[in-house]
């Protein structure tokens, strides 16, 4: 220790003498001194000696070109950074600089003159330049020694006055091949592809060998950008450097592979497998600053967990388990430093699928205020591992060869629905029904198969998929020669029941036709051999005395069936039979039938059957409701001839009174919302409750004005408009002309309650002449 102290004192004295001489060359005997390692600096030199040595280096930039080269050793086991031929320790710590700046802190700054990397703290460099306006030339310090593992330190002084250092590593292989990394040329390392290998030396160091030694793996250095990292070197206290300990939680990273299929991008997870069993790897990356996405250089440290076997991830040794940790590099530049901490074994940086992990290094000269950034990305299999923005250790499981999952994507095809031909449908009860295309039933030939009952059912398939039946039921008919039903597109039921004859008159009870919609016209029917019923000639109805009176109509369905068309469920209802009186018929034959002689039965929805008793030979009347006023006093021969009949609306809360049944029926349709009168004008289709409303509406289409003013010959569509117009003439003349409007019926106060049948309106214009007792009266008759 005393010899070392003496040497340090001599170096300090020599530095002071050099400072007094004004920057002369240093003593050449210090150039051949051996480099010293860490751990033996116990005494600190005086600040005066340090200042003298620093000033001598600033004053003589070109005199130390022949000094010994600096070799920096990074010891991961102790966490120290050393200069090999200088008795000091360097430490890499972060500073509060703009960007990703690092500084080197010298723990024991020596006083010798060959310390080429020692600078006072006042001249430390950063990424942000000071405001000095002096422009000085760039100063460069480099060494020419070929010692393996050395670094070349280049001092760069910016025009602003700040000092920066570029540290260029000089690598040498085992065979003595020199590898020079030039930061100014990004294409100089393109030829190094596949020529650098990392071999564990067993002493916590790495040896770079040529690719022709083994066939393990390759370390690629590609895409070097022109970037430099400002390095600040100042004396300080040695603090052990933590290389692999990073605070924060561990985040799981899942590697996915984007695949574009048919315009759709899918992210498929990559499953890694080794031939006979693989090892897990851990890749840790330091957190990047908010300004950049990467850190200032990465260090790939291989730490095999199983040191008894080979640490290669090749399929030849499937039992190996390797942990790969990428932490922040402690090198002086942004170039990647590769250190293997394996005691035994060999690390190959290629995966089992022969896909190479590419380490991209980038360096740019720091000449502006922009941040110096180094883009170093570890790309296994062409995929990038996204870096977390927090100080967390990202853990990636790397297990052998990636195997892509096979995903089969089938293009969607449009469903083609074809028309289903008539086929059999299996019902729950086991019966099979053959569907038949829906078509009008034109002609049905019926023959007597049962003397008591004949039931004919024709199935049709509705558009909604349901099967409806057209039914014609004939009871108590012994023989039936021919029956034609035309335009019967809906389900219907016809029942003919013969009754006994009395007094030479045969009565037949006919059940009404049950439909679910439009009117049905029954044209002709041939009935023969019916008991107590003679042949009916439709052409001779007038002479035969056949009278078809009011037939009550209801909506019903065939027994055992329910029709669900349009969401309406129809239930079977009880129908009172209608009596048709037939008299004076003696073997009439069927002849020509004219349209005005056909018996037509119009069926309308909304009409209900009253519960009146049907008696043969009595005239039936249609009633709107079952109130006592509607049922009592029917006909003109009532008990009180002078009493006016009143028809009261039975709807709760209404109570309106009408003198005629037609008025009450129209009023009830207004309650139920039924509008059976539809305008058939093109593109109109409006519906009305009463027929007179429809007629009045049609005049708006035709433009017909039926009502003319007797004074000015103006014409109006409605009579109430004419009445208002006549009053204007009366007011102008001051009562000189009196108009009397007399109707043939009683008018209601409401316009909407006008009678549905035409009325005779008499308009009498009375004018005065010289003799007021004999006025002239002109009468105009208008029908509307």
UniProtKB/Swiss-Prot annotation:
A motif (9aaTAD) lies at residues 467-475. It comes from the Eukaryota. One of its GO terms (cellular component) is cytosol. Residues 1-68, 109-150, 281-390 are annotated as: Disordered. SUPFAM superfamilies: beta-beta-alpha zinc fingers. Residues 121-136, 302-344, 364-380 have a biased composition (Low complexity). The 9aaTAD motif is a transactivation domain present in a large number of yeast and animal transcription factors. In SP4, the motif is inactive. A zinc finger (C2H2-type) spans 647-671, 677-701, 707-729. GO terms for biological process: regulation of transcription by RNA polymerase II. This is Transcription factor Sp4. Its main location: nucleus. Residues 37-46, 109-120, 137-150, 291-301, 346-356, 381-390 have a biased composition (Polar residues). It is found in: Nucleus. Belongs to the Sp1 C2H2-type zinc-finger protein family. The modification Phosphoserine is found at residue 46. Keywords: Activator, DNA-binding, Metal-binding, Nucleus, Phosphoprotein, Repeat, Transcription, Transcription regulation, Zinc, Zinc-finger. Abundant in brain. Pfam families: zf-C2H2. Binds to GT and GC boxes promoters elements. Probable transcriptional activator. One of its GO terms (molecular function) is sequence-specific DNA binding.
